[in-house]
């Protein structure tokens, strides 16, 4: 749609979709706002599996059934597929679920051995020593959630942080405590710049500026900010102004030349 538009297209593409739009339009696309989620301008792909599955490393995924949402998804398919290919991983079967939440449901229901989807930095406990800390990529993706020493959730909820990754997406379907106990994060891939608001070829600059300013103003209004922050909507907690260079780290990650 972006490549074929006559100047009247804007949207909120995923990271990989944006890169493809850039390529299809010869760079004639303007990213203006990047999403922020809980203080982070990035996310990552995560591999999830049952903690008792025996899947603990990348090599353990050989011959197993892979659940992903759809082939256009950065975290669900594109990045994991490239990592699997680069490391000689051949899965035994695939289940295309149609959505991130569906992938986690399929994993819980035993339709596959592992699933891939978005990962998000855990949030620290609101009180105590860790309060106010900021998770950085490369740290334990289950920090403040799962105690590796005793192989269990932190029993004292005051010491436990908040899980905001794909497992949280099924909290209205399953008991989240049970999901976190049963399903773990095997590995992560990234980091990946967040999704954005961008404008297609020759989109009128004055209208684009108005849209950008309106969204920025909405984040100053508590009711509108709550709407943007809704996990069933975009789950944006803030926005940052960006240019195309914001996505250079993703190009580097996949070896894509600009």
Where are the predicted features?
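Hydrophobic residues within well-ordered alpha-helices
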Residues: 2-5, 61, 106-108
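Extracytoplasmic/secreted proteins, especially bacterial periplasmic and envelope-associated proteins
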Residues: 16-20, 56, 60, 79-83, ...
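A structural signal for short loop-to-beta-strand junctions that line the ligand-binding cleft
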Residues: 28-40, 184-188
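Hydrophobic/proline-rich hinge and linker segments of small-molecule sensing/allosteric domains
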Residues: 33-57, 197-199
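Hinge/capping helix and adjacent helix->loop/strand transition within the periplasmic-binding protein
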Residues: 49-65, 202-210, 217-219
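Pocket-lining segment of extracytoplasmic ligand-binding domains
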Residues: 53, 64-204
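An extracytoplasmic/periplasmic, membrane-proximal ligand-sensing/linker region
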Residues: 133-153, 157-163, 198-258
């Amino acid at each position: 749609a972006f490549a074929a538009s006559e100047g009247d297209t804007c949207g909120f593409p995923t990271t990989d979709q944006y890169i493809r739009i850039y390529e299809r339009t010869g760079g004639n696309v303007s990213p203006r706002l990047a999403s922020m989620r809980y203080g982070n301008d990035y996310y990552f792909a995560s591999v999830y599996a049952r903690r008792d599955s025996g899947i603990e490393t990348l090599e353990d995924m050989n011959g197993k059934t892979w659940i992903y949402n759809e082939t256009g998804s950065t975290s669900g398919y594109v990045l994991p597929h490239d990592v699997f290919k680069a490391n000689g991983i051949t899965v035994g079967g695939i289940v295309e679920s149609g959505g991130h939440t569906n992938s986690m449901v399929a994993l819980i229901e035993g339709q596959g051995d592992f699933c891939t989807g978005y990962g998000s930095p855990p949030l620290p406990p609101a009180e105590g020593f860790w309060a106010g800390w900021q998770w950085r990529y490369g740290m334990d993706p289950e920090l403040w959630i799962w105690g590796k020493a005793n192989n269990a959730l932190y029993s004292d909820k005051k010491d436990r942080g908040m899980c905001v990754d794909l497992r949280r997406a099924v909290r209205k379907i399953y008991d989240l405590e049970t999901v976190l106990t049963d399903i773990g994060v095997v590995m992560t891939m990234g980091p990946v710049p967040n999704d954005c608001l961008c404008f297609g070829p020759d989109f009128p600059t004055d209208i684009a500026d108005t849209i950008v300013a309106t969204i920025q103003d909405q984040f100053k209004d508590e009711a509108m900010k709550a709407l943007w922050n809704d996990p069933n909507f975009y789950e944006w907690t803030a926005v940052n102004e960006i240019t195309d260079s914001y996505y250079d780290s993703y190009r580097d990650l996949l070896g894509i030349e600009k």
